Structure formats: structure tokens, C-alpha cells
């Protein structure tokens, strides 16, 4: 069975392109609130689960031991734009355990933020691992390892104690089985595990509400949510979906993008978790899907919905800034 068309790209009065996908909204008790497409097919959540990957850093006491602030905790969950503040914060996290960028095993790439990339190129510099959008997460892994008295070298390997703790946290929160059959390698070299959308949404419902989690894990989840709500610019960057939407909605929503058209979110006040996947891996489709679900289910007042509207139906502009069309939720999201 094919997944339904969930987002259409309109140009003028016609549909120019269409994206198929699947999505689930689950409550903290595991009940399906709404679903479309195949929500039981395992997908790689990629960066959408970075907040879950940061749980051991908090609940182990490492964050307190190293006196990590809210901005640093937020960066540990980020797919950041490589702005100066992102790079400086990741560097400061490493310095707390006597390390530098040479300890990072995520690889280097040009900053996701155009402004940051241009700034580097302007002075003839090349990007380092600190500019990798995952450097905050990796700095968090290194901080966790050092605080636990572990050698951080090789921390990206599946059998390293850091990744064993991370996998255990994800499995606990989502109640998904993670094993060698579901494991692959992330773009930043750590393990990634294929998990059904149903389990991802359930996990984010529990992450948002704390329901069903051990008290220490629930407190860690709440601390991560609060850190990101207070520092939305750290989770992504200017003009990017997660930063802009969480700036609008504050602690009422937690959203996190992942590569290849995956998106997860939580509505903590409502005890709901959301997970979507665009079949073709299109980030624009996943963003529109999540925005449509937030708008439909969030219970926001008209003022907030008006501010969210540009993300529910994003305008398509040409190179002169002329509006030529829009993305629109379709099918089960229309």
C-alpha cells in the first residue's frame, strides 16, 4: 500500500509536485490520536532524536558536574547552523574536559548557515569539525565520557560505553527494539537505528510529558526541553524551522528535524508525540507535515496560529522575491 500524498507544491493554480508520506500522533499512554500512511515501517530518525541522545549527559550528573549551562545543553541537541555562537559554545564544552576540536569524531563540513559559510570563505578559512551541525551533540558525548571517567576516543563506535548508554535511552523512551539488524551509520558517524513512526511518536509523547519514564529520566527530559525553549537559536539557527517555530511556541512545543524527511515533535501540555516521514526524503515536506499537525492539534490561540501559518503553507518565491506558489498540506492533512 502506498503512503498518501500529504503535501503538494502549487505553482499558480496547478499542483506542480507532490510528496507522499506517513505520520503518527500518539499520546503518552500509547494510544493513536491520529495516523496516516504506514506508521509501523521502521525509518531512520537521524537527527530527530538528538534530544533523546542527550538524556545520558543529564541524568548521569555529567552536566551538573561540568556546570553545563542551558545554552550548552540546547546545543547538545542541535543541528546547528555553524554560527559563531554555535562554534564557540561547542568549543567551550570541550574545554570543560580539557579537550579541543581534535577530539571530535563527527567530521567537518561547511556551516549549514549561509551567513556563517560566507564569513569563513571571506577570510579564506576552511570549516573544522566545530562547524559540523552535530558538533554540539558530539561535544556532549565527550563531556559525558570524561565525566564518567571513560576514554572518549572511539566514542562513535556502537560498542563504546557512550553509544551503549545512548541506545539504551532511546530504546527505553520509545520502547523500540534496537539491534544489529536495525543499526546503520549516521552522517556524523554514530549509530542510527531504524524505528517505526509509531514508536518515535510514543517516545516523544513520553519525552514531553514524562509519563511512564523513571523520575530521573523524566527530570532530564524536562531540563532538556526547558534549555531548548530558553535558547531556540542554539537548536538550529536564524530562519530555520526549529528555531523559528520554538521561538513562536516556546515551551508549548518541542520540534526536531532529521535528515531524509523525518521530523519529531512533542506537545508537552497535551501529552502528545508526533513523528512524520516524507517518502522522498524532502525536508520541506516533513516541515509542512509537522507544522500542519501542530496547527491542528496544538490548541493554540488565533494569534499563535497566525504566526505559525507561514510554516503550515510556506510561500514559494522566485529569485526576484515574487511569490509564485506555495506548499499546502494535502490528503489527510488538508
Listing of model-derived features with the role each one plays in the protein:
Residues 59-66, 98-102, 148-154, 160-167, ...:
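Bacterial peptidoglycan biogenesis and beta-lactam-recognition machinery
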Amino acid at each position: 500500500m502506498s503512503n498518501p500524498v500529504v503535501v503538494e507544491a502549487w505553482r499558480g493554480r496547478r499542483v506542480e509536485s507532490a510528496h507522499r508520506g506517513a505520520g503518527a500522533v500518539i499520546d503518552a499512554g500509547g494510544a493513536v490520536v491520529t495516523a496516516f500512511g504506514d506508521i509501523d515501517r521502521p525509518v531512520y530518525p537521524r537527527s530527530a532524536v538528538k534530544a533523546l541522545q542527550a538524556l545520558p549527559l543529564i541524568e548521569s550528573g555529567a552536566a551538573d558536574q561540568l556546570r553545563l549551562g542551558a545554552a550548552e545543553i540546547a546545543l547538545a541537541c542541535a543541528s546547528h547552523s555553524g554560527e559563531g555562537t554555535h562554534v564557540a559554545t561547542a568549543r567551550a564544552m570541550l574545554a570543560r574536559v580539557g579537550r579541543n576540536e581534535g577530539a571530535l569524531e563527527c567530521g567537518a563540513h561547511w556551516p549549514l548557515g549561509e551567513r556563517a559559510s560566507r564569513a569563513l570563505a571571506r577570510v579564506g578559512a576552511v570549516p573544522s569539525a566545530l562547524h559540523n551541525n552535530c558538533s554540539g551533540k558530539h561535544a556532549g558525548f565527550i563531556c559525558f565520557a570524561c565525566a564518567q571517567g571513560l576514554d572518549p576516543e572511539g566514542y562513535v563506535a556502537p560498542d563504546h560505553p557512550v553509544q551503549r548508554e545512548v541506545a539504551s535511552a532511546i530504546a527505553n523512551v520509545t520502547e523500540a527494539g534496537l539491534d544489529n539488524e536495525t543499526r546503520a551509520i549516521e552522517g556524523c558517524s554514530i549509530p542510527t537505528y531504524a524505528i517505526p513512526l509509531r514508536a518515535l511518536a510514543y517516545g516523544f509523547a513520553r519525552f514531553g510529558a514524562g509519563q511512564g519514564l523513571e523520575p530521573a529520566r523524566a527530570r532530564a527530559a524536562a531540563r532538556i526541553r526547558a534549555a531548548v525553549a530558553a535558547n531556540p537559536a542554539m537548536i538550529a539557527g536564524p530562519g530555520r524551522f526549529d528555531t523559528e517555530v520554538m521561538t513562536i511556541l516556546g515551551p508549548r512545543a518541542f520540534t526536531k528535524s532529521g535528515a531524509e524527511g523525518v521530523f519529531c515533535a512533542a506537545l508537552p501540555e497535551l501529552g502528545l508525540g508526533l513523528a512524520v516521514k516524507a517518502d522522498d526524503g524532502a525536508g520541506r515536506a516533513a516541515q509542512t507535515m509537522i507544522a500542519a499537525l501542530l496547527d491542528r492539534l496544538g490548541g493554540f490561540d488565533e494569534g499563535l496560529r497566525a504566526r505559525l501559518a507561514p510554516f503550515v503553507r510556506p510561500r514559494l518565491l522566485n529569485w526576484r522575491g515574487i511569490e509564485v506558489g506555495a506548499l499546502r498540506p494535502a490528503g489527510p492533512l488538508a
